[in-house]
Amino acid sequence: MSGESFGHVETWPGERPPWPGRLWRYTVAVALLAWSAMSALAQTWPFPWPEDRIARYTARRTSSPLVIDGRLDEAAWRAAERSPRFADLIGGGPGIHDTRAAVLWDETYLYVGYWIEEPFVEATLTERDSPIYKNNDVELFIAGRDAYYEFEINAFGTIYEVFFIWEREFESSRYARRPEFDRSRTGVRPFNGVGFRQHPRGPRIGYWNWDLAGLDTAVHVDGTINDNKDRDRGWTAELRIPWRSLEPLAMPDSRALPPRDGDEWRMDFSRFNQYKEAPPAKDSGGWAWSPHGVWDSHIPELFTRVRFSTELVGQK
């Protein structure tokens, strides 16, 4: 396109220029409408993954407590609906190795299971609250209205936990009144996300000194860990979380613990690897049940919607 004025129209001698003003006004009006629509959309949904593509899941009840051994071989786990294969956290393409998760519950506990395909199972970190994300791991985030909990585990069964509170709600949601959330304690520091730093709710306060009371976990390796002379099938991880220990998440909106039939919680299920599928595959090294469109797990609005049903698992 040339650099001529948009309003210039060539005419024959004696003719009036045809509708340049109207054309300009029409074009400006269309542009303003388009800009307004895009602005409204951005204000309505300011997150990097479409709202209509967020995963949904129904968690059903188990009739008896589960033994936490990491094997996931009890009847309830065999009957539980598993997630789809985890997809790339950023792009949404399938991960090179299969990863799935499932959720069960009863009156006392929330149960989460992971099935992790890994041909060469590896782990190095053995000290609790080590940076497990530097190993191949699986992760769970559980969000309340004004806070969320992060959990990570590697193939050794070493765990990492953090509790995050949205700073704007620290006072209004009564966290400031609780000694366990004293901001002067060791291990407390500000946090503003990883790859998505424009979150509309702003920064969080992270409690790296916080442990979820009564948490029980186990892993089972189907192969030989840290021995690449053979090929492994992978590993499984199993979590049991007391409902009463999620009270800090439930506090701001007084949600029921255990949940009532039809209640919804937001949870994120992911896997992070120290390896990637070779190009041209677009493998970020992080896979999730519900992708985020950006390298950041800390976006509760993009967590899987988990609805709790009082229906017993396996009855449908």
Predicted regions span which residues?
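N-terminal compositionally biased or targeting/leader segments
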Residues: 13-15, 31, 278
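Structural preference for beta-rich elements and adjacent junctions enriched in aromatics
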Residues: 43-316
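Bacterial N-terminal signal peptides that target proteins for export
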Residues: 10-27
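Serine residues within intrinsically disordered or low-complexity segments
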Residues: 2-5
